[in-house]
């Protein structure tokens, strides 16, 4: 069992596992994964925290959202889910797509979100600005998945396991266990899941970027302690400095670079759990 001692629940169509006792922390997964990416970190944190790990709307066992995939909408859904679980204020940590939801929740609900952790991602607005010239090759999926329906859906449906498996295999410095990989693929290959994932990326290309731009124009910044972690790029020359990007949004920022691939919660769970614990001491 990947989450010993955790309860499995469904709240308003959102599949969620939760367990532990202590200050509440919400852990959000990325693409093309599910709550399982947090299995090691969550069980460690449950010694000191009330840990909540949902499948994002449209991912895994969670139903697609009725009101679209804007991160503002998903963030509000997560806040409502946590309130339904009895948590009016909490910390939030996200990886990849989940970090974008966490970022939006922290900007939109600063009275609710007390601590923010973001893993291996930069905000949507900054990401689009960085993907210029040949740098766009590394983020090709951002452009593909954001194309109008149903072009990418049809392309991916021709061989979804190869498509999603490409990211699971090539973004990881250490292989994802075969049973976990199979679960991710099973949750992503259905027509409903493929469409939901594409809608998630379409939102990032348009409405999410607009929301970020409006916040930047208004001078809004993150008011809580923020932890930003990312993989060591090694010999890859990133088209941006993650620390500089996040410092522009977060006055109270700490950063960590880990020697691993993209999937930090799976590849370096002990380091991630330790960093989260430190975040909550600030």
Where are these regions (language model features)?
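Alpha-helical elements of the RecA-like P-loop NTPase motor core of helicases
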Residues: 36-39, 195, 274
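A short, glycine- and basic residue-enriched loop/turn
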Residues: 34-35, 100, 261
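Conserved strand-to-helix beginnings and helix N-cap segments that scaffold or border functional pockets
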Residues: 38-39, 239-240, 269-270
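Flexible "cap/lid" subdomain of the alpha/beta-hydrolase fold that forms the substrate-access gate
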Residues: 2-10, 14-17, 24, 52, ...
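Conserved HGGG/HGGXW glycine-rich cap/lid loop of the alpha/beta-hydrolase fold
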Residues: 17-61
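Catalytic histidine-centered segment of alpha/beta-hydrolase-like enzymes
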Residues: 261-269, 273
């Amino acid at each position: 069992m990947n989450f010993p001692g955790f309860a499995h629940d469904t709240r308003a169509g959102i599949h969620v596992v939760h367990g532990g006792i202590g200050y509440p922390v919400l852990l959000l997964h990325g693409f093309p994964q599910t709550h399982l990416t947090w299995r090691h970190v969550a069980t460690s944190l449950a010694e000191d925290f009330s840990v909540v790990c949902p499948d994002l709307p449209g991912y895994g066992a969670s139903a697609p959202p009725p009101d679209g995939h804007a991160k503002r909408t998903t963030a509000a859904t997560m806040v409502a889910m946590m309130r339904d679980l009895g948590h009016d204020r909490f910390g939030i940590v996200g990886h990849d797509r989940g970090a974008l939801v966490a970022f939006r929740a922290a900007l939109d609900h600063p009275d609710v979100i007390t601590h923010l952790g973001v893993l291996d991602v930069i905000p949507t607005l900054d990401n689009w600005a960085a993907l210029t010239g040949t740098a766009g090759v590394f983020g090709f999926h951002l452009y593909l998945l954001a194309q109008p329906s149903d072009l990418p859906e049809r392309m991916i449906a021709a061989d979804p396991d190869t498509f999603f498996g490409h990211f699971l295999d090539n973004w990881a410095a250490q292989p994802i266990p075969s049973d976990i990989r199979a679960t991710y693929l099973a949750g992503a290959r259905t027509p409903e899941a493929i469409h939901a994932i594409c809608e998630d990326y379409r939102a990032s290309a348009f409405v999410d970027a607009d929301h970020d731009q409006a916040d930047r124009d208004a001078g809004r910044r993150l008011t809580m302690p923020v932890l930003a972690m990312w993989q060591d790029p090694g010999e890859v020359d990133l088209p941006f400095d993650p620390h500089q990007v996040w410092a522009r949004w977060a006055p109270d920022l700490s950063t960590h670079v880990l020697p691993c691939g993209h999937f930090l919660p799976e590849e370096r769970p002990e380091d991630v759990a330790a960093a989260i614990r430190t975040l909550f001491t600030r």
